[in-house]
């Protein structure tokens, strides 16, 4: 059996509520910029939810031909834009000689929800003959991967993971394993989501998952007293990851190394986490075991931290159960306090934050931290970014259905 290959991050691309590229998104995260505001994409008057993290000043026609864009749902459009940025950042040349060894693995939690709404209205109002022939290709969650591979010409391993809010992290984890075992030299991977639609807001509201707070400064406040649900966000976070051998051969810039991946199932409830965060705790331990490290080795954890009453508390319990005494010295921040919850895309964005935290020795804060929940008594990096020398960082994603996914990143050393 061949030895596992080392896997490094060489490119990044982002669309988020706090920036339309990686540079802007990261700078605003370190500044503690709040990307949450009143929803403009749809009329929210009939709903109890009125806030979300929308993209700002973004026009898809600046990136994709209008005719082509009309044949894609927004979640696919976002993936293409972020993937192009990541590949350009990595200076990855996809050509006839390399295409078979470069794959794509991008997930979406809910896929083309807006496409579904439009097609359903056409069906009800005008009959089945008026439904677009592009309806199914626009709807299905794997189409972000499909369209990105077509757009970039990547012909290697190709797939899509759907694990609700753990989608982005699971996608990167699966791509990591593909490269680690030598099935590809590089993978374009992450998550994408465009959930700010009537049906998504109505559905998540009905499940009482969303915050009904209309104050943009307090609606999303992870680990704080009075938190009442998550605030939805949209965007995409895409990485180029590749074998160290490949990266060094072409002189690529390396942000960080991926060294561990853990994924588990709660087998407990369709939306609620297992008591005491048991499933999340096992995923964190599995990721550390995969990386060959102990809790004391980790300096920073980008928490799932969605600002739900039960979810935040259970994640804190999971962290304490996993890290023990080391939890007292761990920096734990929720960047969702700034971006909102990007569902399937959140793991991609937060992998970028984790890697850049290592590279720049800075940790983005948990903003809106003014009324701490005494039961969530971790160092959540309140309100202001902090300097921190990081060797290992971890990123948690926990999804409906009991999906738990964790990645471990390491400062790169040749």
Swiss-Prot record:
Belongs to the thiolase-like superfamily. Beta-ketoacyl-ACP synthases family. It catalyses: a fatty acyl-[ACP] + malonyl-[ACP] + H(+) = a 3-oxoacyl-[ACP] + holo-[ACP] + CO2; (9Z)-hexadecenoyl-[ACP] + malonyl-[ACP] + H(+) = 3-oxo-(11Z)-octadecenoyl-[ACP] + holo-[ACP] + CO2. GO terms for cellular component: cytosol. Pathway: Lipid metabolism; fatty acid biosynthesis. GO terms for molecular function: 3-oxoacyl-[acyl-carrier-protein] synthase activity. Its EC number is 2.3.1.179. It is an enzyme of class 2 (transferase). NCBIfam families: fabF, PRK06333.1, PRK07314.1. This is 3-oxoacyl-[acyl-carrier-protein] synthase 2. InterPro entries: 3-oxoacyl-ACP_synth-2 (IPR017568), Beta-ketoacyl_synthase (IPR000794), Ketoacyl_synth_AS (IPR018201), Ketoacyl_synth_C (IPR014031), Ketoacyl_synth_N (IPR014030), PKS_Beta-ketoAc_synthase_dom (IPR020841), Thiolase-like (IPR016039). Gene3D superfamilies: 3.40.47.10. One of its GO terms (biological process) is fatty acid biosynthetic process. Involved in the type II fatty acid elongation cycle. Catalyzes the elongation of a wide range of acyl-ACP by the addition of two carbons from malonyl-ACP to an acyl acceptor. Can efficiently catalyze the conversion of palmitoleoyl-ACP (cis-hexadec-9-enoyl-ACP) to cis-vaccenoyl-ACP (cis-octadec-11-enoyl-ACP), an essential step in the thermal regulation of fatty acid composition. It comes from the Bacteria.
